[in-house]
Structures are given as structure tokens and as C-alpha cells.
């Protein structure tokens, strides 16, 4: 298995001893986080709103939890319901990160960031990248958006929000429960109680049953309960522009599987569960690919996540395939969320 770049520290999620420097820095990080949060709570640092509803999707842990698939699905649902959503994102990993810009499906990933380009490509929605989420939200409103979805903005308190959706990894949860860098927490786990919805990413979970109602969790209850999200894959898209084919057509075959995401093993496991022989190649999250990265020494199909695929379009050939990922949640979750947003829209229009 190819492994390149930094990985999540093992001691975040197991019983490995925590290095002394990390143990010493964690209280400092926690204190700074608490002071900053308190300043906003007391009004000494001001929050600013926009004249449309704002939905923030984020997590209290560092690393990937499935926010991007949920963001794409939420934006698509909003479009189907008649909204004109806009997405505000930092655009992590892009060049010249301090420059705000519009992102569409054709924006180079180096300028827009892999996740914003993927969101624009999958949804066609207006996407604005800016380190200042408030400025991004204002630009989206001026562009005609009537609802803002803020991708990974839970800790960006300057932007006032109407709905917070926490996304948490169903297996790892909050790890060892310690603050960065001794553990994975950006904020104390208790912060999750203040969120309106919690979405638990079960990963593939092909045999799991998604409950029709929210499941409460002691001591970290979100306002509207906990909802389980399942990620599914059922097709592969040739990156040379040919028609998609069923994923099942690769069952029993060996493939190179590429993933430059926070938890690459999750993608590999999903392919294995479909009966595909996986030769895994894990890259760092937000890795910038070059054609030579795919010199694996054997001519097998190369399957990758869509987040990786948007970065490989300039040198794609007939051996490269993207695997579309779908986020599935209970119908009751969407009813609850969309009903709340409809009420918020009326409130904003009356303001």
C-alpha cells in the first residue's frame, strides 16, 4: 500500500501514549479557544448576519468527517425545493489563499481548492472562496442567492448563522476527547450540544438500517437529534468522457484505488465490499497530483474519489475513473431541516 505524507496521529484515536509536547500545548489551545468563544458569546466580538438564512456545516474535530458529500447533497436538495443556494468556503489548499474568488466547475483546483471545485461541478451552484466567510456570504447574497451554505464554518463565529449541522465520524467520534494537538478536538465535545442537527457518518454501511427518526445521544445532544448518514457508491465514471458504467462490472477484478482524503481506508473498504480487488494508494488530504503519481508499474484501472478526480482532469486518460459518492439520510431529516428553513425564510423576509 502506497503511503505518502502526514497522517492523523494514532494517539488521537487509540491508547498510544500522547507525546509530552502535545500534552503541554493542548491546555493552551483549549484556553485560547474558550476565550475566543466567550468573547463572541458576550458580544465583545461581534457577529454579523446576512439577510438570508445561513446553514453552517462543520465539525468539532479536526480532519474529514464527510462534510463535502453532505454539502453537495444539501445544496442539491435545496435546489430541488426551489431555493437558490450559494456555498461559502475557505478553499483549503489553494494557491494564494488570501484572494477571494468565484469558483465554477472549470476553475483550476490550484485557484479554487479541490472541495469548492467539486461542489461547483456537482451542483452548478454559486461558490465563493474566501478566508472571511462573512465576506463570502455577502458576495453570494449580492449575486442573487437566497440561502447560504457555509462549508466547514462551525468555528467561524464572525458569520451569524441560523442552523448548525455537526458532522461526526461514526467510528471515531471524538477520539480520546482531548483538545488539539493532544487529541482531535477543535472545541470541547460539549460544543456539539449547541448544534441544531448532528449527522453521523456511518461510511459505507451498506447493510446498516438508517432509522427514520433521530437518535438522541446522552451528554452531547444536538437540538434536533442525531441522524445517521450512509455513503453509497454504485457506478464509475471514465475520466476520458465516456459513459458511466456500473461499479458491479468491476467485481472480481483488481484495480488501483487512489484516495487523497482524510480517511482513505474508508474508500478502499467501500470498493472491497463490492467485490473489487483493491491495490490501495493513499495520498495526503488535498494532495496535488501529477501524472507520475500514477506510475504504479501495472496497467490496471485506476479508481479514485471525485475529490481526487477534479485534480486529475488535465492528464486524465482511459485508465482513470472517478467514483461518485452519494450521501443518504432519512427522509425525516430533510423534512425537519427544510421545514425549519422555510420558517427562517419567512422570518428573514419580515425583518
UniProtKB/Swiss-Prot annotation:
The protein's matches in HAMAP family, at most eight in alphabetical order, are given as:
LpxK
- What is this protein identified as? Tetraacyldisaccharide 4'-kinase
Stated family: Belongs to the LpxK family.
Recorded GO terms, molecular function? ATP binding; tetraacyldisaccharide 4'-kinase activity
Q: What is the primary gene name for this protein? A: lpxK
Per the record's keyword annotation, is Kinase included, yes or no? yes
Which Gene Ontology terms describe the biological processes this protein takes part in? Answer: lipid A biosynthetic process; lipopolysaccharide core region biosynthetic process
This entry's Enzyme Commission designation comes to 2.7.1.130
The pathway noted for it is: Glycolipid biosynthesis; lipid IV(A) biosynthesis; lipid IV(A) from (3R)-3-hydroxytetradecanoyl-[acyl-carrier-protein] and UDP-N-acetyl-alpha-D-glucosamine: step 6/6
Please give the function described in this protein's UniProt entry.
Transfers the gamma-phosphate of ATP to the 4'-position of a tetraacyldisaccharide 1-phosphate intermediate (termed DS-1-P) to form tetraacyldisaccharide 1,4'-bis-phosphate (lipid IVA).
* SUPFAM superfamilies hit by this protein: P-loop containing nucleoside triphosphate hydrolases
Q: Identify which top EC class this enzyme belongs to.
A: transferase
Q: Which domain of life is it from?
A: Bacteria
A GO term from the CC aspect: plasma membrane
Q: Which organism's genome codes for this protein?
A: Xanthomonas campestris pv. campestris (strain B100)
Q: Which residues bind ATP per the record?
A: 61-68
Q: Which reaction does it catalyse?
A: a lipid A disaccharide + ATP = a lipid IVA + ADP + H(+)
- Keywords (A to Z) from UniProt: ATP-binding, Kinase, Lipid A biosynthesis, Lipid biosynthesis, Lipid metabolism, Nucleotide-binding, Transferase
Has UniProt tagged this entry with the keyword Oxidoreductase? no
Amino acid at each position: 500500500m502506497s503511503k505518502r505524507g502526514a497522517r492523523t496521529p494514532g494517539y488521537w484515536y487509540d491508547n498510544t501514549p500522547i507525546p509530552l509536547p502535545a500534552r503541554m500545548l493542548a491546555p493552551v489551545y483549549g484556553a485560547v479557544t474558550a476565550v475566543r468563544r466567550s468573547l463572541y458569546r458576550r458580544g465583545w466580538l461581534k457577529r454579523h448576519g446576512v439577510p438570508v438564512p445561513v446553514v453552517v456545516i462543520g465539525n468539532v474535530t479536526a480532519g474529514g468527517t464527510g462534510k463535502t458529500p453532505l454539502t453537495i447533497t444539501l445544496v442539491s436538495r435545496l435546489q430541488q425545493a426551489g431555493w437558490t443556494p450559494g456555498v461559502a468556503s475557505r478553499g483549503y489548499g489553494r494557491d494564494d489563499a488570501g484572494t477571494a474568488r468565484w469558483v465554477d466547475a472549470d476553475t483550476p483546483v490550484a485557484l479554487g481548492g479541490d472541495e469548492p471545485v467539486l461542489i461547483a461541478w456537482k451542483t452548478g451552484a454559486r461558490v465563493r472562496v474566501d478566508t472571511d466567510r462573512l465576506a463570502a456570504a455577502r458576495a453570494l447574497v449580492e449575486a442573487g442567492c437566497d440561502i447560504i451554505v457555509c462549508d466547514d464554518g462551525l468555528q467561524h463565529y464572525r458569520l451569524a448563522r441560523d442552523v448548525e449541522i455537526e458532522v461526526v465520524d461514526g467510528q471515531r467520534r471524538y477520539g480520546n476527547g482531548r483538545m488539539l494537538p493532544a487529541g482531535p478536538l477543535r472545541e470541547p465535545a460539549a460544543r456539539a450540544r449547541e448544534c441544531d442537527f448532528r449527522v453521523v457518518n456511518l461510511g459505507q454501511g451498506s447493510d446498516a438500517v438508517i432509522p427514520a427518526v433521530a437518535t438522541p445521544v446522552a451528554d452531547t445532544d444536538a437540538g434536533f437529534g442525531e441522524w445517521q448518514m450512509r455513503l453509497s457508491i454504485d457506478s464509475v465514471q471514465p475520466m476520458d468522457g465516456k459513459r458511466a458504467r456500473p461499479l458491479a462490472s468491476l467485481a472480481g477484478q483488481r484495480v488501483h484505488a487512489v484516495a487523497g482524503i482524510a480517511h482513505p481506508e474508508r474508500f478502499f473498504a467501500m470498493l472491497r465490499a463490492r467485490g473489487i480487488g483493491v491495490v490501495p494508494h493513499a495520498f495526503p488530504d488535498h494532495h496535488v497530483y501529477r501524472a507520475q503519481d500514477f506510475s504504479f508499474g501495472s496497467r490496471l484501472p485506476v479508481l479514485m474519489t471525485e475529490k481526487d478526480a477534479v485534480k486529475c482532469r488535465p492528464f486524465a486518460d482511459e485508465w482513470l475513473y472517478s467514483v461518485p459518492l452519494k450521501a443518504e439520510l432519512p427522509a425525516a431529516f430533510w423534512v425537519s431541516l427544510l421545514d425549519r428553513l422555510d420558517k427562517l425564510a419567512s422570518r428573514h423576509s419580515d425583518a
